[in-house]
């Protein structure tokens, strides 16, 4: 799920923390990828027609492998160096959120059955996406694929995004590639969204800077964590009736959740019973992560014959397509070997602002300006949403 409404909140209150980057701007950059989150997205989107997912002749789902193969190939061809990190066991505090997700899946499955019986194809397609779940076997298949492609791959002891953030803080990678904004709550120095989007989507990479985030909001690191808990996170519930804007206002006024609870009308804004916000805060401050101190990251040439054995012979992929991917990656590696990184390659970042929740009016000078100019909106980022189910 990430942090509810955080992107919109930053767009309005700390636009300098966000910038649009070209995909090619990440040439020679190391990026830790939240693999588990992206596998789920591939299971929903890649090769889906109605409620039918991409499968091989044996009926095995291959959407996760197809999606990861093509997105990984695109990154490697662009000179990006991905590091894949997979979820380990969920933290105990996430049990409530996981139970809610299970209930929602069961509700969706019941509604899906009714939609099938009614012949409502639009509802069938929508509801079938809500019933998707990623198995341990599918995660291990993607890890095997990454290793055959010559990419470092790790299973985190707990949440993948927390270990990704630890890698970024340690300087092992430049940024974390994920759609989940709670990676920023784990204090990852840079978070890159849309890095795994298909080329056809033509989405710029949306990069968030942690230090500029807390500076732009006027908060300390601890206050930012409390803000994220108030907005809504995976680890605990939040105060009913308090959305992101109100949460920011309250944190700025009172400084902490404890002080907020002392000050607000709890009948108007009832907090959850036995609210474990302190436990959630501790999870964000000191998450269980992999020891990254002794990690030596290296990228190798793809194991072409190993990929053919796995994808073609086991999973019925087309051999010419698999070999074509390997050829493109080899060509990119050869080109990268003869290049040095040029800082001039990066154009000036485009700082973006948003009109989410408010209308920006351009003030006129010396009486100049028209009504048309006064009513013109600046480009927002409301299309960017975190999604974790």
From Swiss-Prot:
It is an enzyme of class 3 (hydrolase). GO terms for cellular component: mitochondrion; nucleolus; nucleoplasm. DNA binds at residues 71, 159, 232, 234. Its cofactor is Mg(2+). It is found in: Nucleus, Nucleolus; Nucleus, Nucleoplasm; Mitochondrion. The keyword Ribonucleoprotein does not apply. Mg(2+) 1 binds at residues 34, 87, 159, 161. One of its GO terms (molecular function) is magnesium ion binding. The keyword Nuclease applies. InterPro entries: 5-3_exonuclease, 5-3_exonuclease_C_sf, Flap_endonuc, HhH2, PIN-like_dom_sf, XPG-I_dom, XPG/Rad2, XPG_CS. Mg(2+) 2 binds at residues 180, 182, 234. Residues 374-389 have a biased composition (Basic residues). Keywords: DNA damage, DNA repair, DNA replication, Endonuclease, Exonuclease, Hydrolase, Magnesium, Metal-binding, Mitochondrion, Nuclease, Nucleus, Phosphoprotein. Binds 2 magnesium ions per subunit. They probably participate in the reaction catalyzed by the enzyme. May bind an additional third magnesium ion after substrate binding. Residues 1-105 are annotated as: N-domain. Residues 123-254 are annotated as: I-domain. Belongs to the XPG/RAD2 endonuclease family. FEN1 subfamily. Interacts with PCNA. Three molecules of FEN1 bind to one PCNA trimer with each molecule binding to one PCNA monomer. PCNA stimulates the nuclease activity without altering cleavage specificity. Structure-specific nuclease with 5'-flap endonuclease and 5'-3' exonuclease activities involved in DNA replication and repair. During DNA replication, cleaves the 5'-overhanging flap structure that is generated by displacement synthesis when DNA polymerase encounters the 5'-end of a downstream Okazaki fragment. It enters the flap from the 5'-end and then tracks to cleave the flap base, leaving a nick for ligation. Also involved in the long patch base excision repair (LP-BER) pathway, by cleaving within the apurinic/apyrimidinic (AP) site-terminated flap. This is Flap endonuclease 1. It comes from Ostreococcus tauri. The gene is FEN1.
């Amino acid at each position: 799920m990430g942090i509810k409404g955080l992107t919109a909140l930053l767009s309005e209150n700390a636009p300098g923390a966000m910038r649009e980057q070209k995909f090619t701007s990440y040439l020679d950059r190391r990026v830790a990828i939240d693999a588990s989150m992206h596998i789920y997205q591939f299971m929903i989107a890649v090769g889906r027609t109605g409620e039918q997912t991409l499968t091989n002749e044996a009926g095995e789902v291959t959407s996760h492998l197809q999606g990861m193969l093509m997105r990984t190939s695109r990154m490697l061809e662009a000179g990006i160096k991905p590091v894949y990190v997979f979820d380990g066991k969920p933290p105990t505090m996430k049990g409530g959120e996981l139970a809610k997700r299970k209930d929602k899946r069961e509700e969706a499955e019941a509604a899906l059955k009714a939609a099938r019986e009614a012949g409502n194809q639009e509802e069938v397609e929508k509801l079938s996406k809500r019933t998707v779940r990623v198995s341990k076997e599918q995660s291990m298949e993607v890890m095997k694929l990454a290793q055959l492609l010559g990419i470092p791959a790790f299973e985190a002891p707990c949440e993948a995004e927390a270990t990704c953030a630890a890698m970024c803080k340690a300087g092992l990678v430049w940024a974390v590639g994920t759609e989940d904004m709670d990676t920023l709550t784990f204090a990852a120095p840079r978070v890159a969204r849309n890095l795994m989007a298909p080329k056809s989507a033509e989405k710029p990479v949306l990069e968030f800077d942690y230090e500029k985030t807390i500076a732009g909001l006027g908060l300390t690191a601890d206050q930012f964590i409390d803000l994220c808990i108030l907005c809504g996170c995976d680890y605990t519930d939040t105060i009913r009736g308090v959305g992101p804007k109100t949460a920011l206002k309250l944190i700025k006024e009172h400084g902490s959740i404890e002080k907020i609870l002392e000050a607000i009308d709890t009948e108007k804004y009832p907090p959850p019973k036995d609210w474990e916000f302190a436990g959630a805060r501790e999870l964000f401050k000191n998450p269980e992560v992999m020891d990254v101190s002794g990690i030596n990251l290296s990228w190798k040439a793809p194991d072409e014959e190993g990929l053919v054995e796995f994808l073609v012979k086991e999973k019925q992929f087309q051999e010419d397509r698999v070999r074509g991917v390997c050829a493109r990656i080899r060509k990119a590696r050869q080109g990268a070997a003869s290049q040095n990184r040029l800082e001039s390659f990066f154009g000036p970042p485009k700082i973006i602002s948003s009109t989410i929740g408010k209308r920006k009016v351009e003030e006129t000078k010396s009486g100049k300006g028209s009504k048309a100019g006064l009513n013109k909106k600046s480009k927002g980022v409301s299309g960017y949403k975190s999604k974790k189910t």
